[in-house]
A protein has these predicted regions:
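C-terminal "cap" of GNAT-fold acetyltransferases
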Residues: 163-193
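Conserved GNAT acetyl-CoA-binding A-motif
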Residues: 120, 127-139
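Conserved catalytic-core motifs of GNAT/GCN5-like acyltransferases
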Residues: 136-139, 151-173
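Helix-loop element at the rim of GNAT/NAT acetyltransferase active sites that forms part
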Residues: 17-18, 31, 36-50
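Conserved active-site alpha-helix within GNAT-family acetyltransferase domains
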Residues: 113, 117, 129, 141-160
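Glycine-rich phosphate/pyrophosphate-binding loop shared by adenosine-nucleotide-utilizing enzymes
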Residues: 19-21, 79-85, 173
Length: 193
C-alpha cells in the first residue's frame, strides 16, 4: 500500500548545525546500531523508554512488520550513526483506528538540531496516506525540545496533567498529550470512517 511512498527513501536533509542527515525506514541490519543508540540516550530519558525497546523485542516486532502496516519506524543517520528514531504506529481496528501514534527519540548530541522536525514531516505524510485523520503523541512534561518541535509542526497540546505519570524510579512527572488533525488520503480511509 505504501510502496510508492517508500521509493522516496533515503531522504536527505541538512540539520540546523549544517550536518548532512539521511532518513530511512528501519532495516533488519540496524539491530546493533539501534541498541548502541539506545545506550547513549541519557538516563533521565531511559526512565520513560519502554522496556520492549531496551530488551530488543520491539525491534523484532518492527522487523516482522516488513510491509509497515502497523508501524513505520524511521531512523535518521548522521556520519553513519543513528541520530534519531521516529515511529508512526497505526491501530489496526477499534474506535481509535483513525488516530495514529507518533514517538521520537533523539541522540543527545543532536537534540535541538531539527531531526524531529524532518521525521515529523515524513510521518505526517505517511499518516495521511494511511487514511488517518489525526496523529497523537504522549510525552512527559520534561521533553521540552520535543514538545517545541511538535508544536512547530502543527501539533497542539491537548492535555497536560501535572504529576500524573511515573518513571521507572517511581518519580512523578507531567503527562502531555499532543495531537494534530490531518487531511487524509480519502481513497485509503477504512470502512465506517
Amino acid at each position: 500500500m505504501i510502496d510508492f511512498l517508500l521509493e522516496k527513501f533515503p531522504v536527505r536533509c541538512e540539520l540546523r548545525d549544517g550536518s548532512p542527515c539521511s532518513i530511512r525506514p528501519l532495516e533488519a541490519t540496524d539491530e546493533a546500531a539501534l541498541k548502541e543508540f539506545h545506550h547513549v540516550i541519557p538516563e533521565r530519558e531511559q526512565l520513560f523508554v519502554r522496556n520492549k525497546i531496551l530488551d530488543g523485542s520491539l525491534f523484532q516486532e518492527w522487523i516482522a512488520d516488513d510491509s509497515f502496516e502497523s508501524n513505520l519506524p524511521l531512523l535518521a543517520f548522521v556520519d553513519a550513526k543513528i541520530a534519531g528514531l521516529g515511529v508512526l504506529a497505526q491501530r489496526q481496528g477499534g474506535w481509535k483506528r483513525h488516530i495514529g501514534k507518533v514517538a521520537f527519540l533523539t541522540h543527545p548530541d543532536y537534540c535541538g538540531q531539527g531531526i524531529i522536525d524532518e521525521m515529523m514531516k515524513l510521518l505526517v505524510d505517511f499518516g495521511a496516506h494511511y487514511g488517518m485523520t489525526r496523529l497523537e503523541s504522549e510525552l512527559n512534561g520534561e521533553r521540552k525540545s520535543a514538545i517545541k518541535s511538535m508544536a512547530a509542526a502543527g501539533f497542539q497540546e491537548l492535555v497536560r496533567i501535572p504529576e500524573y505519570i511515573q518513571d521507572m524510579n517511581a518519580q512523578y512527572h507531567d503527562y502531555v498529550l499532543m495531537g494534530i488533525e490531518l487531511i487524509p488520503d480519502f481513497e485509503n480511509l477504512g470502512a465506517g470512517d
